[in-house]
């Protein structure tokens, strides 16, 4: 009877671990498995070792579950806050912020659909949910993560056009932004559907059913297509666009510095992209770059300096110089003569112009470095391994594989921080969500 009970327990554990019973050996003192045996030829440690065979392993698994659970929670909360802020705060409902809204939705899907199953797989260290769910999970992973990355490309494009084209802000309608969002999700869908339609390596079913490992298709052609579409082409576009944005900011700052040296008074910058102060709005960082470049004086759009005479023209509509994203109108850091002093009397106590402009240039570099650096640092390790493993048939440590995957997921945790922390309007909206409507929105000086 006791042996029958032990055999029943043995059958349950073997069913859970999918181990061939006839090849297992057992201790003579009882029905406890000896996990240090080789089960069958060609099997791996995924089958030959128990998930929590020692107290230390159980503690490690519990710690891992807590850390991953907190990461998932932080990702959900951060993106829900961004979505709620845009939907509930009227002044944040703009065409440009729709890109941030869609990005937050993509990252929220990563947190709700992809990361939980990934956490279970990471803690248990084997896939016991079958090939069908594995196929759905990996395809959903590709869809949501690709959409998240491509949204960053769309935001970079929106920001670049706003910087370089004065008319873009007024042409950036909800319809145009909606088309960008539709393109992002369409491309992401085509990248993920390829695996569901059968673009898999020959060992995919065996890897899931026998090795109990669930990874995306390791077919070389698919990996080249997927990694190029999801990362390598997007990261190249992002780097080029942000480099051009930085060059534009730097050129304007130095142009203003040169004008000051010639005439003694620095004119406000009025480049083709000066309208970025009016609209920007792509998640707050566009507005931060605007602040770096410099806001033009309210109601004054052009100033020409000839010797000691300033001739100002007021031929630009006020909305083009106001900050449509609701940012506070901080006084500029350079003087515009008597008119500027009348608007901002504190200008006479400002730092020397050269130091202020150098600070703006460093801030521009820092802001754009944070955007690109966080994205590249999070996703580059994963995509290097993704293309390296199937092409060279390399053996990569499971720990390294897991770290690179979760570092990529961590980008969905960072996005709501990076793309809103530079915007006072988003920060104030978060305060209103947390503290209620008692927190009043600060208004720019009229």
UniProtKB/Swiss-Prot annotation:
Region Disordered: list its residue ranges.
304-329
SMART domains to which the protein is assigned, alphabetical: 7TM_GPCR_Srsx
Segments spanning the bilayer are 66-88, 99-120, 136-157, 177-199, 228-249, 368-391, 400-422
Q: Where is the composition biased (Polar residues)?
A: 304-324
Please report any disulfide bonds recorded for this protein chain, giving both cysteine positions: 134-214
The answer to whether the entry has keyword Hydrolase is: no
GO aspect biological process, one term: adenylate cyclase-activating adrenergic receptor signaling pathway
Annotated membrane topology = Multi-pass membrane protein
Q: Where in or outside the cell is it found? A: Cell membrane
Q: Tell me which UniProt keywords the record has, alphabetically.
A: Cell membrane, Disulfide bond, G-protein coupled receptor, Glycoprotein, Membrane, Receptor, Transducer, Transmembrane, Transmembrane helix
What Gene3D superfamilies has UniProt attached to this entry?
A: Rhodopsin 7-helix transmembrane proteins
Protein name stated in the entry: 5-hydroxytryptamine receptor
Its annotated function is as follows: This is a receptor for 5-hydroxytryptamine (serotonin), a biogenic hormone that function as a neurotransmitter, a hormone, and a mitogen.
Q: Which residues lie on this side of the membrane: Cytoplasmic?
A: 89-98, 158-176, 250-367, 423-446
Naturally occurring in which organism (per UniProt): Bombyx mori (Silk moth)
A Pfam family for this UniProt protein? 7tm_1
Q: Which residues are glycosylated?
A: 23, 27, 36, 42
- Coiled-coil intervals, chain numbering: none
- An example Gene Ontology molecular-function term: G protein-coupled receptor activity
Stretches assigned to the Extracellular side: 1-65, 121-135, 200-227, 392-399
Family listed:
Belongs to the G-protein coupled receptor 1 family.
- Record's Gene Ontology CC terms? plasma membrane
